[in-house]
Design a protein with these regions (language model features):
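Ser/Thr/Gly-rich low-complexity blocks that favor extended beta-strand/coil architectures
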Residues: 111, 135-137, 142, 158-198, ...
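Small/polar beta-strand repeat architecture
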Residues: 181-228, 360-363, 368-404, 408, ...
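Right-handed parallel beta-helix/beta-solenoid
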Residues: 29-60
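The right-handed parallel beta-helix/beta-solenoid scaffold, focusing on the short coil/turn
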Residues: 73, 80, 90, 98-100, ...
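Short glycine/acidic-rich loop motifs that flank beta-strands on beta-rich extracellular proteins
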Residues: 86-89, 111-117, 137-141, 228-230, ...
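N-terminal extracellular ligand-recognition/capping segment immediately after the signal peptide
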Residues: 45-49, 58-66, 70-100, 104-119, ...
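N-terminal secretory signal peptides and thylakoid transit peptides that target proteins
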Residues: 1-18
Length: 597
């Protein structure tokens, strides 16, 4: 049975440790082999691009790019609409540029099929301004469920999404009516069987697993045959994306892999206004993976991504062999050599963790890194401890990891999670609403080799509403909060009580946040020390609790050295402590009461 994690892992696999799936083995446009010119500026209309969108602009845009020099060049799209024919190639491919600027002047770039619109590799000091990315035919369809059974559904597909029964359906995402519009129900199926046309715009879809879709609910059918990102940056530095919008993409809207010093200003991943679409990108909204320096994210608007709204993570690398006392071979998740932009530079510190528990074993500086078949070889000036062997995990140390600074951002819902992050994150003055799962998830993910453990995270002055409304009942040990801090990304679903999580997370501050209308507790934290929850406000939490049960505002499992104080609630609710030490101090929290188990 394919689960959500497996499907989303497939959609994002190219961007984690092995990063080069889309960069390797794909037919490229002739531009990739064309030497750069020496022009400082090129307007695509001067090379024949049609700003009315009536003609294919591919050749004209590539002619314009071919004239540009590698330093301080500017590519200009005059205002208008530019259409691009379907292809399995990278349409605009830049490598080794410095000072590149791409100005859109509000232009809409409309793509088709599996085309990858824009890829930049090993570029420095680059800017992209004022462009909107769209697909002529979205890589999904949506409609209304007319019949539903345990092993199949009949869907009346909206006329805006023409279907003939030959479309491949990779996943089904359920939505139910809620107030002003549909919200993700949390009913999602990734194991889809045969599809048959049963009349004009009516599809009968077999399911390989049981699902609880309801007649009358809205549903989205994901079709993408690839995990193509609309914008992909690999190994780039000093990046500015400003007023760039993405209405859909077959995979993530934006992927930044192995990049440094990123500024995202007014980036939007949203359904096309007025389209009535329930989702935007078919993968994550924005992925910031294995990056360094600072990522400053301001005024972003994220809505409707099928995966996480934003994902900020580092890769775990598993030792496949200790070659000698001062070198180790590390395996990539895709079995390929690690691309150059992901090799840690000389002097980079790596943290070393025990695979079974994620317990930190120490840190070591890299003296040399080189790609080898199946991964990379790291060499060190120091001698490795005998405790380090096959299976041990390496990850960038905290001093080398990216620092996320997020301010004034809006996450407006989707069928999964708003923000996934791990460490060195400051999230302020932002709002999260309408997610089937948590608004913010902080947890390492060994299944997909993403980390590190949670450390040095501050979430302040944010609002959370209408989250964790998925149709499911969680037993003790499986809770998720609007903010969830855990030792694993998914709850442990077992017949017996969940195992006590290892205490590996630390240094989390949650202050002056407002929580309301939540299906689950506002905060769930497991396996942590030094959690500070102060001056938050809670209202109408835990709405999906069992009948007769008292609502839970906060659930804490196996915590130490933590403080929960000065919080307020509009109604009685509980602070639940499970397997916590006596160094967890809870008090002065208005009508919130303490419960220990």
């Amino acid at each position: 049975m394919m689960e959500r994690r497996e499907f989303l892992g497939h959609m994002a696999r190219a961007t984690v440790a092995g990063g080069a799936v889309l960069a390797v083995g794909r037919r490229a446009w002739p531009l990739a082999e064309t030497p750069a010119g020496n022009a400082r500026r090129a307007s695509v209309v001067d090379f024949g691009a049609d700003p009315t969108g009536q003609k294919d602009a591919t050749a004209a845009v590539q002619r314009a790019i071919a004239t540009l020099g590698k330093r301080n060049a500017r590519l200009v799209f005059p205002a208008g609409k530019y259409s691009f024919a379907a292809s399995d190639a990278v349409l605009m491919d830049f490598r080794g540029y410095e000072g590149l600027e791409i100005f859109g002047n509000g232009a809409e770039l409309s793509f088709a099929g599996a085309t990858q619109p824009l890829r930049l590799t090993d570029c420095k000091d680059l800017e992209i301004h004022d462009i909107t990315v769209e697909w002529t035919r979205p890589p999904f369809s949506q409609g209304i469920i007319r019949a539903a059974g345990a092993r199949g559904v009949t869907v009346a597909v909206d006329a805006a999404y023409p279907v003939d029964g030959t479309e491949r359906v990779q996943a089904l995402l359920g939505f139910e009516s809620h107030g002003k519009g549909p919200l993700a129900s949390g009913v999602t199926v990734y194991n889809v069987g045969a599809v048959q046309l049963k009349g004009s715009q009516v599809l009968e879809i077999a399911l390989a697993e049981r699902a609880s879709f309801k007649v009358g609910d809205s549903i989205v059918l994901l079709h993408p045959a690839s995990d193509t990102a609309a914008l992909r940056l690999e190994g780039c530095e000093q990046i500015l994306l400003e007023t760039v919008s993405f209405h859909t993409a077959p995979g993530a809207a934006v992927v930044l892999s192995g990049c440094g010093d990123i500024t995202l200003n007014t980036v939007r991943v949203i359904p096309h206004p007025g389209s009535g679409r329930l989702i935007s990108s078919c993968g994550d909204g924005v992925e910031i993976l294995d990056c360094t320096g600072t990522a400053s994210v301001q005024h972003a608007l994220i809505q409707g991504s099928a995966g996480a709204g934003m994902r900020v993570q580092q890769a775990y690398w598993r030792v496949s062999q200790v070659a000698d006392p001062q070198s180790a071979l590390l395996a990539s998740t895709d079995g390929k050599p690690v691309p150059e932009w992901l090799l840690p530079p000389q002097g980079t510190y790596m943290q070393i963790s025990e695979a079974a528990t994620l317990k930190l074993l120490g840190e070591i500086a890299v003296s040399k890194a080189e790609a080898v078949p199946g991964g990379m070889r790291l060499s060190f000036s120091e001698t490795l401890s005998p405790a380090i062997g096959k299976g041990t995990l390496f990850c960038l140390s905290a001093t080398n990891q990216l620092q996320l600074k997020m301010d004034d951002c809006k996450f407006r819902g989707g069928p999964y999670i708003g923000l996934v992050a791990q460490s060195r994150a400051r999230i302020g003055n932002s709002s999260f609403s309408g997610y089937a799962g948590p608004a913010i998830l902080l947890a390492p993910d060994l299944e997909h080799m993403r980390g590190p453990v949670v450390e040095n995270v501050h979430i302040t002055d944010c609002s959370f509403s209408d989250c964790n409304l998925a149709r499911r009942t969680l037993t003790p040990g499986e809770e998720r909060g609007a903010i969830t801090i855990d030792t694993k990304p998914e709850p442990q679903v077992e017949q017996e009580a969940a195992a006590i999580p290892n205490r590996i997370n630390e240094g989390i501050t949650l202050q002056r946040n407002v929580f309301s209308q939540l299906g689950a507790p506002a905060i769930y934290c497991a396996g942590a020390s030094w959690l500070d929850v102060e001056s938050n406000r809670f209202g109408d939490c835990d709405r999906l609790r069992p009948a007769g049960a008292e609502p839970r505002a906060i659930v804490l499992r196996n915590l130490d050295e933590s403080t929960i104080t000065g919080n307020e609630a509009s109604a009685a609710a509980k602070v639940v402590m499970i397997d916590c030490t006596d160094k967890v101090k809870v008090g002065d929290n208005g009508p919130l009461t303490n419960a220990t188990s």
